């Protein structure tokens, strides 16, 4: 522990002295990130070479895949096409709650309409809702 503290104190003092004498390393121009422009240019060139190599490898792989597809008569999968899973389903397609409610209303209307009871059903509905509202007013949870 004592050795570490001594190195820190001596090192800091030594850095101050050399900095004061102008012995700092001014290794050329620095960019915003603190790197030489040559290093940045070399890194960009290396990245471009890597991307080009990757593109060529992917082309070769695709050519190989296409050869296999041709050999075994396999169709290429299209990513944009959505799969239709309804044909493998045991039951029919599911209906939304709105579709079910519409069917129920259509059935009710047709039976009631056939019997000529639409006016009586509407009266019964209004009386039931009025009674419900009246009863709801008596209970504390209905307010």
UniProtKB/Swiss-Prot annotation:
Gene3D superfamilies assigned: Single Helix bin
Keyword Metal-binding belongs to the record: no
Basic and acidic residues: compositionally biased ranges: 23-33, 44-71
Entry keywords, A to Z: Coiled coil, Cytoplasm, Exocytosis, Neurotransmitter transport, Transport
Annotated region (Disordered), positions in chain: 15-71
Main function: Positively regulates a late step in synaptic vesicle exocytosis.
Location in the cell: Cytoplasm, Cytosol
GO molecular function: SNARE binding; syntaxin binding
InterPro entries, sorted: Synaphin
GO cellular component, one term: cytosol
Gene coding for it: cpx-1
Annotated organism of origin: Caenorhabditis briggsae
Protein name as it appears in the record: Putative complexin-1
């Amino acid at each position: 522990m004592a050795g570490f503290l001594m190195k820190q104190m001596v090192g800091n003092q030594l850095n101050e002295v050399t900095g004061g004498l102008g012995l700092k390393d001014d290794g050329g121009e620095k960019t915003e990130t603190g790197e030489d422009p040559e290093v940045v240019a070399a890194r960009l060139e290396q990245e471009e070479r890597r991307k080009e190599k990757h593109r060529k490898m992917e082309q070769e792989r695709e050519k190989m895949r296409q050869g296999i597809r041709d050999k075994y008569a396999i169709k290429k999968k299209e990513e944009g096409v959505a799969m239709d899973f309804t044909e493998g389903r045991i039951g029919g397609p599911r209906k939304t709650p709105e579709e079910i409610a519409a069917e129920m209303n259509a059935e009710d209307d047709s039976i009631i309409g056939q019997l000529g009871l639409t006016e009586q059903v509407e009266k019964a509905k209004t009386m039931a809702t009025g009674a419900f509202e009246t009863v709801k007013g008596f209970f504390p949870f209905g307010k």
